[in-house]
């Protein structure tokens, strides 16, 4: 297990308004989730807050998914006060809208970096990392090691994100410069915190639920009584396994069926 070094701000909590408008020579940039409701990218354009913006899937292997693309946005300096007021009131979008950071790197350097980091390695396979979704990235960033920072967050000097409260991160002093040619791996320590997060557990529960209906439809219909109860029961089953210290990342619908069969057999013999 890799030990994460906490990099949260140890001072009193900082509001969006304070952070966005404090004296700093590093410009503010946003990673926005265009699938959040309402679309925060549209909100930025509607309010004329955009200095520069670009969809990160454009020109990459994910270009066919352009409508789902995260956006890199540099906000106009004169609008930071207004943006801060909206974010403080949680009026921009839902809780998946994205996050903000400061950087001294050029626009092109940042754009190149983020486009290369949309794909990461998970269990030896290349997968899309939905880092623009606060529920995904926010579950992991607190566990980032200096090595994770140097690779995934190479341009970032400071980062602000809405977790249980607005949280401010500084770049760890131990960070190197990073190398975009080195693939970023979602290590065991990041997978662990992801699966222990409410959204991570819900995503896995939904995956098992869909697997059951697609591959074991008859059994899924039988188990889904009363109707709509199956997915919450799967989530509860996974949570119990986590609390017992068991690994759940490779669980499938078949595993759930087997567990239910064993449970029924035990009940029969009682």
Regions found by a protein language model. Give the residues of each.
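A contiguous, surface-oriented mixed alpha/beta subdomain in the mid-to-C-terminal portion of proteins
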Residues: 2-13, 17-20, 25-58, 103-270
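Glycine/small-residue-rich interface belts in oligomeric ring/scaffold proteins
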Residues: 45-77
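A broadly used, surface-exposed interaction patch
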Residues: 64-114
């Amino acid at each position: 297990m890799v030990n994460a070094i906490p990099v949260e701000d140890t001072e009193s909590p900082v509001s969006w308004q304070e952070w966005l408008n404090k004296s700093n020579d590093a410009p503010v940039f946003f990673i926005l989730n265009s699938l959040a409701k309402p679309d925060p990218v549209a909100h930025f354009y509607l309010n004329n807050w955009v200095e520069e913006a670009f969809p990160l899937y454009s020109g990459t292997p994910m270009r066919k998914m352009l409508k789902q693309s995260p956006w890199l946005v540099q906000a106009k300096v004169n609008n930071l006060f207004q943006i801060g007021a909206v974010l403080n009131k949680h009026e921009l979008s839902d809780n998946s809208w994205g996050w903000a950071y400061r950087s001294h790197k050029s626009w092109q350097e940042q754009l190149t970096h983020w486009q290369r980091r949309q794909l990461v390695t998970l269990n030896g396979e290349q997968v899309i990392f939905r880092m623009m979704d606060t529920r995904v990235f926010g579950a992991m960033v607190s566990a980032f090691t200096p090595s994770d920072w140097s690779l995934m967050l190479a341009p970032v000097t400071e980062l602000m994100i809405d977790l249980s409260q607005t949280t401010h991160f500084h770049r760890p002093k131990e960070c190197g410069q990073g190398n975009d040619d080195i693939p970023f791996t979602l290590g065991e320590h990041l997978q662990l915190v992801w699966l222990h997060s409410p959204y991570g557990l819900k995503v896995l529960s939904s995956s098992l639920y869909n697997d059951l209906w697609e591959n074991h439809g008859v059994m899924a219909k039988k188990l889904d009584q009363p109707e709509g109860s199956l997915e919450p029961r799967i989530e509860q089953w996974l949570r119990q396994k986590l609390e017992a210290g068991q690994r759940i990342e490779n669980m499938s619908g078949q595993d759930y069926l087997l567990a239910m069969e064993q449970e029924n057999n035990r009940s029969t013999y009682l």
